[in-house]
Amino acid sequence: MIDKIERYFKHFDFDIRETHNARFLDQKVTPDVLSIVIDCTLTYIQNNNIDEFTSTDIRTSDYSNENIIDIFGKTDVNNPKAKNEYDKFFHQPLKALASAKILKETKRGRQIYFTILNREILEYISVKEKNSLEFLNIYLEKVLRDSSIWHLFENFFNYPTKDNFDFLKVQYEIFIIQHTPINGKTEVRRIFPKILNTLSFKRKKHGTIKGRFSKDIITRDELMYNRRNWKDISKKKGETRKEYELRAKNEVENIKIAYVKYTLNKAKNIIKKLHLTTSEVTDEFANGEATQIHHIFMKSQYPEISSYLENLILLTATQHFTQAHPNNNTSLINKDYQLLCLLAKSESIQRYNHIYSKEDFLYVIKIGLNYVFPNEIEFDELQSRLIEIYNTN
């Protein structure tokens, strides 16, 4: 899928000196926000059977409200007091994708309407934060290369020192102020960390924290809007340290639970949409409508991969309750049928490689079987090796 995105971008020139667009990325465009906003967008389009939409349409949809409140610990999306914050939360990712030519924007009066230019890339972004991050990395590098300032970033990545960071930051500010309507450093400095840290994380490099050169290599958590650390939650006035710590940790735990629930439900919906009512396992029990989403490696035993698409497979009720789980006992797994599910899933992953990830499938196998395969392994060899493993255990 990365190759497809790169090929698609070759049709466009994102040179800031020509577009004068300083907001090709904005503050709210983080991997987690971008992914969930696009998931909300695609869900809204499907539910309403429309081609054109506004950010307000997405913001006020039931699906957005159900998930944003719990996952981000926010108030109701229709709360008037939160309107300004939510407008940015939903609008900025859509604007960024319009800049990237994934969406098309049309202004009529004061309202901006969006339509889809590349659904495949949108679906890829919506699947998981990891995909969203891959997209942002490709897009940002493309913008900076087209604008002939990539060498400034490359120099910093090759020689990550405070002096080189300061030089990069100043040169970027000068460039943006010179070629876009932004005329002050403050606004440039709000957006710069989102750009640098996204690129830094992918390259395992230093970046920027609170406007300064980071002492450590940028971590994934630094990129996210939804920081999953209780210390990021503010202490309330009059609250004791113990009360604050207990409340903050509970809030973070509730957010984590909500996020796992959301990702699992999203994964199940994606699989049903991909495979419709046809079982992924072709055997004598595949007749009839496939309605059951089965965890190849049990959710109770392997919670860390419970919401991975590559660990979920669509089966008929007969397959699920008589083959995958012997005698309808969902606490047991039929190892022979587990192998069939893995082999069938590998076929699905090859067929729908813009949705599934071979790398994530290998991770699922690593957790479930405690066996590591190299990322370079071909699917034919992988299938043969899986058969060997199950036949010798």
Where are these regions (language model features)?
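Histidine-centered nuclease catalytic patch
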Residues: L276-I313, Q323-N328, K335
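Mixed-charge, low-complexity interaction segments
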Residues: I2-T263, L332-L340, S346
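Short amphipathic alpha-helical surface micro-motifs
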Residues: E85-Y86, A96, I271-T278, H294-F297
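Short beta-strand element of the conserved SAM-dependent methyltransferase core
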Residues: F114, L314-T316
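Short, flexible loop/turn elements at secondary-structure junctions
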Residues: K101, H295-S300, T316-H320, Y390
